[in-house]
């Protein structure tokens, strides 16, 4: 996203507006000038993609989570060592104005995912990688950042606006690190390139907006938003502007270098300033550019999206709640204390999930976990709290039915419009006087054990609650995800006994970075890749349910590196298929073997794979009852 063609133009045609800079020197100068600790605001998702590609991690395995977390901790420490305080801000929602762009990207990315699975048929080695990021890491990275000792926040509107505004309003911020050409347009602190960032020297390129405007465009900095709206951005689409831009070109190729001089002269001749308070100017621009005044509102919206002196109002919770609840929803979202889905659900009645690494061999994960989400919706919106019932569910503030717009990227879903999903009731809930608790009571009044009981009811898994309640916090998400895959989602298991055993065993390894790095790159097959995706989508769903229930366990225990490593899982699964042995899975360590039997008993309890009933000796040759 950003301004169409601007990065290429500035790098190829504006040498003085692209300066190599040292972040350490910039920070020192800022501290000397303002006597504050210098802060660098980092576009979180942008950083995540760049840093993940930096390492040796292979995303198709499902994520080498511990290695990624340690790498992130290393770079955060390095920032602090040069006197810079990094603050990460992540996309916390998809704005309505960007939904079409989001959908188009998801469709393109899902086509790429299917190509990856085609590659698996030709090459089963780990080197055949997607070049992307592991499933769900975009939803979880802000929590990894927080545990690594840095500040992390989630936006409640378009992240580039939030980042630009935060930087402009805080004197201690000296720069923004990202790769989005919109930051050249915003009148905020200096914009540093993530693409050119050197992870060793901490040097990069500064895109100088003042130099670009005055020296190369011959416009004022304040006119850059208008320039953006006339060359194409996320609101005023390039496709709409193409006929106008073509009329300014010397050739039939609509490249910025071919029309930029004529465009800037045109702006000056018309005396356009981009003043959003002048509706007359908006109409004049629309008439000249599009041939009618019909697009004046679009120009106005495009310009307003860069106006940092405007506050974008935060959406309110869609049902009637107390001011305390309203405030808590926004604070938990901003401070990364809830799953990011909660804000979108409560305030916009939307659920968004990007493409994941899966093929067409089974139902898409988005559909498999949908009923669990639907039960979350029922709890979040008080749909079935008396006097409401299944026959008479709760409504929004305005009296509308609770219907969630689900935007989930999977094969066969064109996302021309959302899927409309209704809440589902809970079965046999026995806490809080035999009724479904109000969402405010669930968050603020119930004990952790009572919250965990609601969590268990939402999942509808075979595992007995008492066994769940006795688990260490680090094993709750793992155990519940596996129990769902065995008997909570479909009538027949979605996971084989040997695969269950491998998931349990790898969770119990005392993982060390060096040992994980030294593991040989495993052979890959589509089934194992699909399985890891299914598991990680389950982890993400557990996060949603736990946040729905007021976080009965601390967020940090939900993070995958506590119980999962993708490379280790593939390595152990390959070994187990050749030599299925408990002792081999557990590194021949008696203490690990003992923990394995204990955790496996919990995971499979009351299911078709229950260790007291299923012939596990046929699965693992040295299995002992």
Which residue ranges define each predicted feature?
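Acidic carboxylate-rich catalytic motifs and surrounding loops in phosphoryl-/glycosyl-chemistry enzymes
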Residues: 90-92, 151-162
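Charged, low-complexity intrinsically disordered segments
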Residues: 1-81, 85-90, 94-126, 140-144, ...
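Active-site neighborhood for divalent-cation/phosphate handling
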Residues: 131-137, 156-164
